Amino acid sequence: MSDTPQLVVHRDKELMAEAAAARLITKIVDAQSSRGSASVVLTGGRNGNGLLAALAASPARDAVDWSRLDLWWGDERFLPEGDPERNVTQAREALLDVVPLDPERVHAMPASDGP
């Protein structure tokens, strides 16, 4: 495999999200196979949430051992817990409430009304 980055163009955002989800699932499964667990840093926004929805909809999602996956956030809005504008709230709706994640391995950033 080459270390040279490749530009991959998809005809629409749905296909891009599906392709990214397929690649991410492969990377997670590979990491879990070689290291026992995997960590992923999430972001919000249309593309980030589209990726999470594509992960949730993918039949290949069953290849992931969700109990051995740590989720972190690269950014977050400093709003009250449950606010629909928080990235973690959107991630819960798109993926986290759909797959059997270990809640102890979901590392959300603090909310404005939390500890």
Question: Model-derived features: where do they sit?
Answer:
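Generic structural signal for well-ordered alpha-helical scaffold segments
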Residues: 21-29, 56, 92-96
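Conserved active-site and cofactor/substrate-binding residues in soluble primary-metabolism enzymes
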Residues: 15, 19, 46, 50, ...
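Acidic/polar N-terminal loop/beta-strand segments that form early-domain functional surfaces
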Residues: 10, 43-45, 74
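Residue-level signal for inorganic ion chemistry
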Residues: 24, 45, 106
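Ligand-binding beta-strand-loop-alpha-helix segment within the catalytic cores
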Residues: 2-4, 64-115
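Short beta->alpha linker loops
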Residues: 11, 46, 112-114
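Glycine-rich N-terminal segment of FAD-binding domains in flavoprotein oxidoreductases
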Residues: 32-59
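N-terminal glycine-/serine-/threonine-rich phosphate-binding loop
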Residues: 1-40
